[in-house]
């Protein structure tokens, strides 16, 4: 890593979001005091000037503006049309949210300050712009206040949560990187809350071990994973959570010695994370594996903020309370010889003024190149018809790696550019008809002619009428009606027949006119009757006469009484349909419909026009679509064009097209889909036709290359689809979906077409078609980003050009390790205060959460540590591990006192042999060596060792005052070596009822030379050591200790056996004196585990709530600065020598199933009946189960699928068990639920090893089936 620039400020900061030259904005940090005790508060902008060789290490601000309150946090939003440099938002100490225009700040305009909003009642601790919707801003502050702002309406935010729900302060807020309406907050209460803006409620809460949360970061690639940092000095860890299993963290990152204050997850490479905290360190991690790559140079005060550059992840910045913001890079280089000499040139005169200004040296090299660097060879098509190719060149062994870049020009087809421009101009002019006619003239197939002809008809004012005419079924050409006849004779009518629909409308109120032509009185019978008052005729009649039938009299009486419904019913039963229609006209529409239905039902099987008329009358054209002969599809289409309602017309056309497509009539089906505006249906046919036409054209046109033919064919398809969308005014209803798109094949063509036109320099046209693709569609994001980068104006980069001409610099060599040395590996956390007993022969259960290989720093060949039995040490009980307690490694100590002053520089002298160095090799990420002499700066002198007043104690600077219950800031506890051959895995000892007190030290190798570390677990006393001072004080019982009297149940989170044996030789005598003793033994803890002499079986261990197990061989502890004590008595013990452990066998990969989940094609014959019965019954239950039980039904289905997967793979379930399950299934089918339940209990009790998660599903199915009718 290289320190590129330094900003001399104690301030909150943020990176500029654009891709141009990097700029940093800073605001005076709240809660900090400058070296000159200035109370001035400023917002400043800093240009890094990375391309300026004359720029020194320290920068000067390029813009500055005063503020009336200090900052807790700053965010810089992306640029937009109104704000080309983006918006800067400040979280102020006085509770205000201030916004500034970055462009105006840079130009020095007086109106750079945009707004101030004061909704918070206390300080705003954190804020962040939504990465997916930049206009949305979230702020979090004291008293649990969380507000969501729209920067376009900044004065009207809304609040998430209520004042009563969260009384603790919120310290951080972070938006999800994949889902725009999800964000998370963390605060002093120890909880992480995940919020959903759609519901404006909290959707999930994570328990951060009841420790405060200082920072949150979402996984850049996985929307369900996030990191939380803990600022507590007793638990300085980073948790990785998966929201799909929120009960416990997925991984714990441990490496900081004091609280973690900030984390930053690289958006371009999810394998890179930086964190910083109260231990003055900035560590680089791989959060996916928990591996610690290394750390940046250690500074002299707390580092409270660290952030990757959002667009150039090579750069990162770290802010600390020593008054600097350091800009650094991941690339490595050789240390400057002149700078190293300057560090040793201090004299006593300026020691106190310069000792705390120089960071401690540290370096590391990434084990693999970052994701954006992993490009050994590649090619990229540039816009404007260029292709850039880079590749490595062969070099002699031992020579630096070199690459060459070549740029060449290409052109797919010169006609494509002109054709695209001509088509876009016609679309803009709205001249769709000329486009259709042009394509009709040049059509090469019947399918293409039909498609363009239909689209031409759709352009007309009355498209349905045009479609009917295109089918050759226009109303003017309909056949004339036959001669009408009566009983008295035939009379010809020469009236012209009107179109079908017009005729239907005209006679809608007189549908029965043809039924009365058989009357003997002629057409003018009723017309001759007078309707005026007092009219009298010469035709008297009897209402009820002797000649009438009983039916006629009944109808007459019903009509006289106005009971038309009864009269109609009598006429229908007597098959007098004409009379029924006449009476129904007096009774209303319902009676008319009743008579129509009765008549059409009675004439079933009669001529087809009656059935067609019935479908039209009843608005049931689906009968025509599905049941009419498919050979008459044109007539069916004409009927739909005439009578279908607008809202039903597209679906009816689609159904008719599906019938045609099933018969193989692709062209006719395409016609129906086009008329119905079903783009998702017709586009598949067009793409198939495109591929066929492309193959034929490739065979015919031998001169053209295949891609040129493909490009022209794709151009024709895009034009066809574009015209169709304009004609039908098509709106893509699936543009907001995230999966299962019906137009996925069209989206692929859009992306491909955009690439082609962009290669010809037509970027705006490419952007137009990419906007038609959903935002979350795979492949569209890359194309959009490339267009965005191409259209973004970026400044010149002379530094990059000069870097290409610079000679290769000397590189750091690969470090040579001494013989037998193995690099240390990051270890998970240990169960605190657990002491290892002698190895046991019994093998504990396998632990899937076991730690990796043990540390090579553990001393070999020594006996396990056995504490001396004194009157103050209780017996060693056996306990069980917690549900997800810390695994072996560096544990936590008791609560440590936090002091405001930073700790003094640590002694980083390693006790082990440092690796050798050479100067002639290089690393992958070296940068050219800067030969220019660095500017003079202050440096840290070497501190003379302080003689120790105690025998056998290493000299060094005394640590700051600490709690008497804490050990010194010493080394991390090393894991043990693996067990010797022939021995069973060791078992972890039980934790002490009362944890060991500080002041009992041994010797252990310190942390590697990057920086001195701190451990939170007190060291144990050396064997045989005695104390001539007071006894240690009694400790208050912990309410969190585990208290089972019998061995607790097996726990799959127990630590790996390989980490449970601690070996080491006796350490030297001498230690920090213990605190004053109490006069009685420690009080009994009613919640603590009862002391037991035998270990728990099966690797079941109890967690200790405080620190790591005491280790033999730890260094003696230094006394507090003010202690006036003499050395304790005791003999010396030989120091253990670190020796490398034997290599560990690689763990076997997990066994893969024979067939994938969900496959049911390999179920044996003996189990097929079982699967069929259970599946059938499960479907029955699922169909009838209440909606409130849907989760239970879904879980039962999932568990039954586990059983089916086992049967399909012929694993786990034995043949005799399959027979029992067959009997159980038959009992369920016979509804013998009592027998089925007895069989289930028998299988579960006798075949436990075969019963996985599926047995619960069987049990639930029996209960649900019994309760479902």
From Swiss-Prot:
Residues 879-892 have a biased composition (Gly residues). It is found in: Cytoplasmic vesicle, COPII-coated vesicle membrane; Endoplasmic reticulum membrane. The gene is SEC31. Belongs to the WD repeat SEC31 family. Residues 933-948, 1071-1085, 1106-1144 have a biased composition (Pro residues). It comes from Pyricularia oryzae (strain 70-15 / ATCC MYA-4617 / FGSC 8958) (Rice blast fungus). Residues 485-497 have a biased composition (Acidic residues). It is a peripheral membrane protein. The lineage of its organism: Eukaryota, Fungi, Dikarya, Ascomycota, Pezizomycotina. Keywords: Cytoplasmic vesicle, Endoplasmic reticulum, ER-Golgi transport, Membrane, Protein transport, Repeat, Transport, WD repeat. This is Protein transport protein SEC31. One of its GO terms (cellular component) is endoplasmic reticulum exit site. Pfam families: SRA1 (PF07304), TPR_Sec16 (PF12931), WD40 (PF00400). GO terms for biological process: COPII-coated vesicle cargo loading; endoplasmic reticulum organization; protein transport. GO terms for molecular function: structural molecule activity.
